[in-house]
Amino acid sequence: MLSRFEGNQLKAEEIHRFSNDPVVLNGVLYWDIVRMMFEIKRSISLALAKGGFDAIGIDTWGVDFGLLDRRGNLMQNPVHYRDPHTVGVPEQVFKIIPKEEIYKKTGIQLMRFNTLYQLYYLAREEPALLTQADQFLLMPDLMAYFLTGEKVQNLEKAVDCPGGDGEGTRPSYHTG
């Protein structure tokens, strides 16, 4: 969407639309982040051709993430929240942290695909991946990194993550 103020009204114009279909590789459902970035860059080019813009906003599903190595390279395509790898994981976590405590800290609905459960799954099932990772970026921040080369974390999404309390406390996104 390309939005602009005309007088005191906000006008929005769709300039490009693309599907966001996950891909299955070896039985795992992944975000097709490479194709998405291609389409996002295409959208930016189309917006520039229509007169440009002052800012870009990235809005996407908040629970999925990418892991970067020490050189800033994406270690694997982000696993899609619809992948069943976290089935049963919340119950394992609740044995360690009561669900009431998780809800009290985050205020978000306890869904099996939340970031906390995805990270717990990785810690249990793929610990080498987390050990080798240098940084963790949620999807909007990962996309912003691919566009700008800057690694930043959006505090609005901190509530979705372990360590974030929804009150401005920044969770640690470095894995090392």
PLM regions with names:
Residues 73-74, 92, 96-97, 101:
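Hydrophobic or amphipathic alpha-helical targeting/insertion segments
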Residues 3, 38-45, 91, 120, ...:
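A broad, structural surface signal
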Residues 1-76, 88, 104:
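N-terminal glycine/serine-rich phosphate-binding loop of ATP-dependent small-molecule kinases
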Residues 83:
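Carbohydrate-associated surface elements
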Residues 102-176:
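Gly/Ser/Thr-rich active-site cleft segment
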Residues 54, 77-78, 128-133:
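Short active-site oxyanion
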